[in-house]
UniProtKB/Swiss-Prot annotation:
This is BTB and MATH domain-containing protein 36. Residues 160-227 form the BTB domain. It comes from Caenorhabditis elegans. The gene is bath-36. Residues 7-136 form the MATH domain.
Length: 320
């Protein structure tokens, strides 16, 4: 593992910090080839001498069920002082921690006294929000192999023969690889389009980093589809006609337990994912399950085609 790959940080901005009650978590982040989740909560217990404290936790590979892995890491938790020009102006704690199947989380119940955390003079809270940060250095891992993710920023002899330009950045790819996976690129490279003979081809209205994710799923790298990239992978695989990536993203959503059913139904609706819609409808086992969906904030964003499917599901349940 390179020194660059084994270090990283998670910066977690918490809105309405003074109203923090139940635990809140940042989305998963990959550092050192393992998945990390930073969370914050308030705690009043014997561990805090019955005084309210800001608590903080860090989860490592929470979803991994294997017992064949371990991770030794150096961790630095920080509550940042806002409106400060000093890089090290923060309240911090440092730990050395070994994570494995039986120890996936480190919890600090008494990270910072609550009154001190929200005190205006201490400058931890600005405009009702605060910022937590964890810096992670993965010192040693076992049972987890390095994932090779390409950046496509350099040409490779015999493997790349065209340059795509996105947001002013060069992306070096092979025509045959893209044409094999994508009808869009097959037509671009091998039909009577002007781009056929161009050494550089500009791709508009696409975020560079998101397109790199798409390429890493098309190419035989080790990019995993997750809750952070599934949305733009669906969008781009639909735009560029890459059915294999669309199918992989659909399979991820079918198996994913974190994405809400309403959001899954919306994805299914937009990208015509019949397997995903069927899986969602199959999870609705009672009429109450169906009617409860209307309370979700994104329920009204659904189109009539999904409403019709939900109505038919409700009718079927009531008739049983």
């Amino acid at each position: 593992m390179s020194g660059k790959d084994n270090k990283g940080s998670i910066r977690f901005e918490i809105q309405n910090f003074s109203g923090l009650a139940k635990a809140t978590e940042h989305k998963p982040v990959q550092i050192g080839h393992v998945e990390w989740i930073l969370g914050a909560f308030t705690s009043t217990s014997d561990a805090t001498n019955n005084a309210k404290h800001l608590g903080i936790h860090l989860k490592c590979n929470e979803e991994l069920r294997s017992n064949l892995w371990s991770c030794d890491a150096s961790i630095r938790f920080s509550l940042l002082r806002l409106n400060s020009n000093e890089d090290d102006d923060a309240f911090s704690m440092e730990f050395q921690q070994k994570f494995d199947d039986l120890n996936k989380i480190v919890v600090v119940n008494n990270f910072k006294n609550w009154e001190e955390a929200i005190c205006y003079d201490n400058r931890f809270v600005l405009d009702k929000h605060a910022v937590l940060e964890v810096q992670i250095t993965v010192n040693k891992i076992a049972g987890i192999h390095e994932r090779i993710i390409e950046t496509f920023d350099q040409p490779k002899e015999h493997l790349t023969d065209v340059v795509l330009v996105l947001e002013g950045k060069h992306v070096h790819v092979g025509k045959q690889v893209l044409a094999t996976s994508s009808q869009f690129f097959q037509k671009m490279f091998y039909s009577n389009f002007a781009e056929k003979t161009q050494a550089e081809i500009k791709i508009d209205d696409v975020t560079h980093s998101e397109f790199i994710d798409l390429l890493n799923v098309i190419y035989p790298t080790h990019m995993l589809i997750n809750s952070s990239n599934v949305s733009h992978l669906l969008k781009l695989s639909d735009r560029f006609a890459v059915p294999r990536v669309l199918e992989k993203a659909e399979t991820f959503l079918i198996l994913d337990q974190k994405t809400h059913l309403i959001d899954k139904l919306k994805f299914a609706e937009v990208y015509r994912l019949s397997r995903l819609q069927n899986a969602c409808l199959s999870q609705l086992e009672t009429s109450e399950d169906v009617t409860a969906l209307k309370h979700h904030e994104n329920y009204k964003s659904l189109d009539h085609i999904t409403y019709n499917a939900l109505l038919q599901k409700l009718i079927d349940l009531l008739e049983d």
